């Protein structure tokens, strides 16, 4: 991505010039503009993203915060805007008509597909687009990394393939190749973390996520991966701060419901059922299409004694899944992914999560 330098951008600060002219003069497609206002110890930061070709406003956000530590405040504002822009620019670029797409176009379209509500269809669409990108450019590190990450997400973590081992092996080979070409690429280290986490190698996955974050602290997917991996590895007390950091950095992220759900799971496994319900309900509100958000609520409601709502949520989870995954405890435990963690975490799942699902009416076999 071509980004104009700060000094050049500042030169337009006091000029009454339209965004279309700025775009033409600088040769840029998008303009980010904003302002900062102070009232006592409070700051209000306003920002908006504008398409310089059409003058259309694509995104806007207002952040209110205490001055406090100015350096920490600057980092948080930068992170939130960067994550929001990443989402908006991917969607905007992918929507542009192009009769002769190249590898980068297919990568953008694939990433846009990943921003859609998660489903077998959206994952399959993304895989197809990343495959096209890689076919057009076999040396593309981005195509290999995105394809590997999507293979892990769909075929392993979501249990939608009978070829889990083969797809995991393919993802492993792709990400090894990508990292050999770009050993400091943060997103590739994140995907490597996803791969080794799917292999049950939690400590190795933690190293990869931390490497990704050291290179790019704004990579919120790595915060999510690190948080869940800490949960699986048994370091439960470290999970909530990581997820709260992800929420602060990207509060409108399509994956924010996953982060809410992780915090809810921590509360459930530590027998704070009322708090778990609060966070699981936030997760359901953010992503009502995800069956596991309803499944988590089914367990939590049952543990709280609200069997009527527990039964309703279990039925909704099964309806959304459309398969046999949620038909029994045995099917759920056989889920082809690294969800139940190390022995300490598995024991907590058994005494809390699975106990709740049994109360909600999920049979053993």
Regions found by a protein language model. Name each.
Residues 94-97, 159-161, 323-341:
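Acidic, Ser/Thr-rich low-complexity linear motifs
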Residues 295, 312-315, 351:
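A generic structural signal for well-ordered alpha-helical surface patches
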Residues 52-53, 147, 321-330:
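Short, compositionally biased low-complexity segments
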Residues 1-275, 279-282, 289, 294-303:
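Acidic, proline/glycine-rich low-complexity intrinsically disordered segments
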Residues 329-365:
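Terminal, low-structured helical/coil segments at or just beyond the last alpha-helical repeat
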Residues 302-325:
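TPR/TPR-like (Sel1-like) alpha-helical repeat modules
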């Amino acid at each position: 991505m071509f980004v104009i330098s700060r000094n050049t951008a500042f030169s337009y600060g006091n000029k009454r010039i339209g965004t279309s002219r700025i775009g033409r003069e600088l040769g840029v497609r998008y303009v980010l503009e904003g302002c900062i206002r102070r009232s006592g110890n409070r700051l209000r930061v306003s920002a908006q993203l504008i398409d310089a070709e059409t003058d259309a406003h694509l995104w806007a956000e207002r952040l209110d915060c205490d001055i406090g530590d100015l350096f920490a405040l600057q980092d948080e504002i930068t992170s939130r805007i960067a994550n929001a822009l990443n989402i908006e620019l991917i969607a905007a670029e992918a929507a542009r008509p192009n009769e002769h797409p190249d590898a980068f176009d297919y990568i953008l379209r694939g990433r846009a597909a990943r921003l859609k509500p998660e489903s077998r269809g959206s994952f399959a669409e993304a895989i197809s687009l990343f495959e096209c990108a890689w076919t057009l450019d076999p040396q593309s590190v981005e195509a290999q990394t995105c394809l590997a990450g999507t293979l892990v997400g769909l075929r392993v973590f979501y249990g939608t393939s009978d070829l889990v081992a083969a797809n995991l092996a393919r993802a492993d080979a792709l990400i090894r190749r990508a990292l050999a070409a770009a050993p400091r690429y943060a997103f590739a280290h994140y995907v490597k973390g996803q791969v080794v986490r799917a292999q049950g190698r939690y400590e190795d996955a933690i190293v990869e996520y931390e490497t990704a974050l050291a290179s790019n602290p704004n990579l919120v997917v790595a915060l999510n991966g690190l948080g869940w991996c800490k949960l699986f590895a048994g370091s439960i007390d470290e999970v909530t701060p990581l997820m709260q950091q992800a929420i602060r950095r990207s509060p409108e992220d399509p994956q924010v419901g996953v982060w809410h759900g992780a915090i809810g799971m921590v509360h459930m496994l530590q027998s704070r059922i009322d708090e778990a319900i609060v966070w699981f309900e936030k997760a359901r509100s953010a992503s009502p299409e995800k069956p596991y958000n309803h499944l988590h609520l089914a367990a939590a409601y049952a543990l709280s004694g609200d069997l009527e709502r527990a039964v309703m949520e279990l039925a909704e989870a099964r309806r959304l899944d459309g398969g046999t995954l949620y038909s029994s405890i045995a099917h759920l435990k056989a889920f082809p992914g690294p969800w139940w963690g190390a022995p300490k975490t598995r024991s907590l799942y058994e005494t809390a999560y699975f106990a709740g699902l049994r109360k909600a009416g999920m049979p053993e076999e």
